A protein has these predicted regions:
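Histidine-centered divalent metal-coordination motifs
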Residues: 6-12, 192, 227
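Mid-to-C-terminal alpha-helical segments outside catalytic/metal-binding sites
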Residues: 1-5, 12-69, 144, 148, ...
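Conserved, mostly hydrophobic/aromatic
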Residues: 6, 115, 149, 158, ...
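A structural motif corresponding to the C-terminal end of an alpha-helix
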Residues: 66-76, 115-126, 185, 214-222, ...
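Active-site gating/metal-coordination segments in enzymes
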Residues: 83-197, 201-205
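Alpha-helical scaffolding within the catalytic cores
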Residues: 59-65, 110-115, 142-145, 208-211, ...
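Divalent metal-dependent hydrolysis catalytic cores, especially in the metallo-beta-lactamase
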Residues: 28-60, 64-93, 97-98, 125-133, ...
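Catalytic pocket-lining loop regions of alpha/beta-barrel enzymes
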Residues: 153-157, 164-281, 289
């Protein structure tokens, strides 16, 4: 089974100009490293246009586009982005096209309704994860929305964004009621405990070590560390060593590694007491270096590096597990 365990869909705001500016901020480091934008100052509009990131070229990613860009995938996990205020705008997952049939104007407070509509469009392909922000309307409202998203909308998991929304993952007053509800509902929780190049994100709130309190308190809650904690990868891996209910997915990290480095990374997991069954493939699609096919092929081709570095190949069954079977087992989807 081939599963993208981390992807996004639709838009982030009803204002298309803001959506482009947000995308530009996130991609600035990538374009600078490629030499397509100046490294020492902010680009001009003309330089953005020349780089290929034109305002008019920002695409809407709907179910059809996601399916098109994931050929051969059995499942695509689509993650909601819960509402928050940024630069005076309310942002979060919205359907600016109206193609999904959710009533009313685009509204980030309907983020889970939009993701549920994506799943209904192709229930055999898409797996929806809800999102809530306990700092937005308080933990009681977040808990109620999570219950609605799972019991009424049928979403299969929860994605949280502490560093972007400026709350700590181990905040007992804000976050623990959400974890308790997720545990009661029997759903996995994926948490962005990793870095971000966005100026407004708080790096101190992205450290994977903040999840240790969750592992100590909620031993029956499945916790997935997004992006394998990059840049704190070793910290994330040690949490997988310590807590039997912790997992990690590879999006973002896999895009920064060469195929050889990815092979070496997989080889060092088990000597560090991290079973490869705890690792999931993900892409963070539709980000700019996050082509699902290229990243899938990078992972499936790692054993071509074995002879070069004089190490044994990663067993095919373990690669198949990372590619999808591990995640399928956690969600009860069944493997192939």
């Amino acid at each position: 089974m081939i599963i993208d365990a981390h992807s996004h869909i639709l838009s982030l705001a009803a204002d298309p100009q803001f959506t482009v500016d947000y995308g530009r901020e996130g991609s600035l480091c990538i374009y600078r490293s490629m030499g397509r934008l100046p490294s020492h100052r902010l680009p001009t509009e003309e330089e953005w246009e020349a780089s290929g990131f034109a305002r008019s070229g920002w695409p809407l990613i709907g179910p059809a586009e996601s399916r098109r860009d994931h050929p051969g995938f059995d499942k695509i996990v689509v993650l909601a982005v819960s509402p928050q205020y940024l630069e005076g705008r309310l942002i979060g997952t919205v359907d600016t096209s109206g193609q999904l049939g959710v009533d009313g104007p685009p509204d980030p407070e309907k983020c889970n309704d939009y993701i549920a509509a994506v799943v209904r469009a192709e229930p055999g392909l898409f797996v929806g994860f809800a999102s809530v922000n306990p700092a937005f309307r308080g933990p009681a409202a977040a808990v109620a929305e999570l219950e609605r998203a799972v019991t009424e909308l049928g979403l299969a998991g929860l994605k949280l964004y502490p560093m972007y929304q400026h709350w700590a993952a181990n905040d007992r007053d804000l976050a623990f009621p959400v974890y308790r509800k997720a545990a009661d509902l029997g759903i996995p929780v994926m948490i962005h405990q990793a870095g971000s190049t966005r100026i407004d994100a708080k790096l101190e709130l992205g450290r994977p070590a903040l999840l240790d309190d969750i592992g100590r308190e909620f031993r029956d809650l499945t916790v997935i560390i997004a992006h394998c904690g990059l840049p704190w990868v070793d910290e994330a891996l040690f949490l997988l060593t310590k807590h039997p209910n912790f997992y990690a997915e590879l999006s973002y990290l896999i895009a920064t590694l060469t195929r050889r480095d990815l092979f070496l990374f997989l080889h060092r997991c088990e000597p560090a007491f991290v079973p490869l069954e705890k690792i999931f493939f993900g892409t963070d699609y539709p980000g700019f270096l996050y082509d699902p096919v290229k990243l899938r092929d990078k992972l499936m081709g790692v054993n071509e590096e074995a002879a070069v570095v004089s190490l044994p190949p990663v067993p095919a069954q373990k690669l198949d597990g990372i590619m999808g079977d591990n995640f399928a087992a956690v969600l009860g989807l069944g493997g192939t």
